[in-house]
Curated annotation (Swiss-Prot):
One of its GO terms (biological process) is vasodilation. Keywords: Amphibian defense peptide, Bradykinin receptor impairing toxin, G-protein coupled receptor impairing toxin, Repeat, Secreted, Signal, Toxin, Vasoactive, Vasodilator. The keyword Signal applies. It is found in: Secreted. This is Kininogen-1c. Its main location: secreted. One of its GO terms (cellular component) is extracellular region. The lineage of its organism: Eukaryota, Metazoa, Chordata, Craniata, Vertebrata. Residues 28-44 have a biased composition (Basic and acidic residues). InterPro entries: Bradykinin. Residues 28-152 are annotated as: Disordered. It comes from Bombina maxima. Expressed by the skin glands. Belongs to the bradykinin-related peptide family. Pfam families: Bradykinin.
């Protein structure tokens, strides 16, 4: 890392001492004149010719059409049932159907939307789990170097 830093610093210092490089361009008003000329020419550059239909500087699914055509794209037809712009477990159904999904039926015992060691049982069953029986000696719910022994 230090080698790259020293090398890049050395190159910059060398470039500043040669004529016609960074040191000269920094203080020369010609570069400002070029910038002003470029800004004056920008409207001409933009008006060179009309863009072809369907052209967009953006790339993507909805950018092959111009921005004016976006409302037409949205109104092309009704979306199929179950369509959602989001992808995921709960987005295969529309947002209106989410309450129906939740009310479909009772969840199976042990089901939980969370995954993990303590989530295989539902939250209602946690007190029962804790009261099932005495913990074996040396048991700790924590895992680690100092948790293999029980605290007395």
């Amino acid at each position: 890392m230090r080698l790259w830093f020293c090398l890049s610093l050395f190159i910059v210092l060398c470039l500043e001492h040669f004529p016609g490089t960074l040191a000269d361009e920094r203080n020369v008003p010609e570069s400002e004149e070029k910038t002003e000329q470029f800004l004056r020419d920008l409207p001409k550059i933009n008006r060179k010719g009309p863009r072809p239909p369907g052209f967009s500087p953006f790339r993507g699914k909805f950018h092959s059409q111009t921005l004016r055509d976006l409302p037409k794209i949205n109104r092309k037809g009704p979306r199929p049932p179950g369509f959602s712009p989001f992808r995921g477990k709960f987005h295969s159904q529309t947002l209106r159907d989410l309450p129906k999904i939740n009310r479909k039926g009772p969840r199976p015992p042990g089901f939980s939307p969370f995954r993990g060691k303590f989530h295989s049982q539902s939250l209602r069953d946690l007190p029962k789990i804790n009261r099932k029986g005495p913990r074996p000696p040396g048991f700790s719910p924590f895992r680690g170097k100092f948790h293999s022994q029980s605290h007395v």
